[in-house]
Regions:
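Start-transfer (signal-anchor) and selected internal transmembrane alpha helices
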Residues: 1-35
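Membrane-lumen/periplasm interface segments of specific transmembrane helices
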Residues: 30, 196, 203-279, 289-297
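Short hydrophobic/aromatic helix or loop-helix immediately within or flanking a transmembrane segment
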Residues: 52-98
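Membrane-embedded glycan-lipid processing machinery
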Residues: 81, 85, 101-108, 141-156, ...
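Transmembrane-helix motifs of polytopic, lipid-linked glycan transferases
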Residues: 91-95, 100-126
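Transmembrane-helix signature of polytopic, membrane-embedded enzymes
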Residues: 117-140, 159
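Transmembrane alpha-helix segments characteristic
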Residues: 132-136, 287-306
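Membrane-interface alpha helices of multi-pass inner-membrane proteins
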Residues: 161-167, 173-201, 218
């Protein structure tokens, strides 16, 4: 059950743990004192938008026509293609009798992911780490998907990114690749994770996986090009552009609000999220199977410090399920950093590499 810190020089391991602890204290203070970036309460929210679009689709209206009507009626900017979601998730929802069916399907997908996550954690940990992780994962996704949350494509995308990560961790790169591509087709915000996966495949010189990525991304390019054409056909000369854009530099406060968009964290004050975020990152980086997840979470945190409107905190659903993998590992990570070193263990930096230990 040893983490990376067990074979690391103790001075370095202790420094990392200390930085995580100080970061947690700083984030707690920030959470309690900084102005809330999403303080403006909108009577009509993005979930309302997509519920109304879905209602029109159930009445027989096509996705793009329905999206144009609802977005225009509620003052959304229409001239940028990125204000229009790609249609995959809404088309899938429109095929189901109600959103309850979608919630059940997502629960089934999450349950399958839990089994794979359990196997992944048990490969290097024990049941005391695996059980809290899978419980946290289940509620972090399912509680977000209740009520109106299921229409938000970020929830399904985050579940698929998690499925991809655990399959890579179990050595099933093909399933991991397909799950990642499914996430991308549902929401283009999965693109940072896709680039991370391609980088991992290149580092490992996995030629077959790189071919798979070339084919998959070519298909996505065709799909998004078709989406672009459909959007351009809907835009009228009188349609307005969004005057603000997404580059807002919301900083650490907005990052915390995205991290708070988690089925479990949402039940607690923001300062709890602030305290647990560094612990989860510490656990992911210390866990020998956690590097892909750690890099993914860190990448999204950096992006959201710059990109995102104040009400886009729900983008956190893309990465917050991964935090549940890291939280249990923060405890053995701290123990390995603080425990006295055995002389025979000092020269050894790493044990035998795990499936996804890069």
């Amino acid at each position: 059950m040893m983490t990376r810190f067990a074979g690391m020089p103790q001075r370095i391991a202790l420094t990392i743990v200390l930085v995580a602890f100080i970061s947690a204290l700083w984030l707690v203070v920030l959470a309690e004192t900084a102005p809330i970036t999403s303080s403006v309460v909108h009577k009509y929210t993005d979930p309302d938008t997509y519920l109304d679009i879905l209602a029109l689709m159930h009445s027989g209206v096509g996705y793009y026509e329905a999206a144009h009507e609802i977005l225009l009626a509620h003052g959304y900017g229409l001239r940028s293609v990125f204000n229009w979601r790609t249609p995959a998730w809404m088309e899938l929802l429109s095929l189901l009798p109600s959103i309850v069916w979608a919630q059940k399907l997502l629960a089934i997908l999450t349950s399958a992911t839990l089994l794979l996550a359990y196997r992944m954690i048990r490969a290097q940990g024990n049941i005391a780490l695996a059980i809290p992780a899978i419980i946290g994962i289940f509620f972090s996704i399912v509680l977000l998907a209740r009520d109106r949350g299921i229409v938000m494509s970020e929830v399904a995308t985050g579940a698929l990114i998690l499925l991809s990560v655990v399959n890579y961790g179990n050595g099933q790169w093909l399933v991991g690749l397909l799950a990642a591509l499914a996430a991308l087709f549902i929401r283009e915000l999965a693109a940072p994770y896709i680039l991370i996966c391609v980088a991992f495949a290149a580092y490992r010189a996995n030629a077959r996986e790189l071919v798979g990525w070339a084919l998959g991304l070519s298909a996505y390019f065709a799909y998004f090009s078709w989406h672009w054409i459909e959007v351009m056909q809907q835009i009228a000369p009188t349609d307005r552009a969004d005057p603000n854009g997404w580059i807002r530099f919301g900083g650490i406060r907005f990052v915390l609000e995205t991290a708070h968009f988690n089925g479990l964290f949402n039940l607690t004050p923001l300062w709890i999220t602030a305290a647990l975020l560094p612990a989860a990152l510490l656990g992911l980086f210390a866990w020998r199977d956690g590097l892909r997840a750690a890099v993914t979470v860190t990448t999204y945190l950096c992006i959201f410090a710059v990109v995102g409107k104040p009400f886009n905190d729900y983008w956190g659903a893309l990465y917050t399920p991964l935090l549940m993998l890291g939280l249990p590992w923060s405890i053995p990570a701290a123990y390995d950093a603080l425990a006295p070193r055995r002389p025979s263990a000092l020269p050894q930096l790493c044990d035998t590499p795990a499936q996804d230990n890069l």
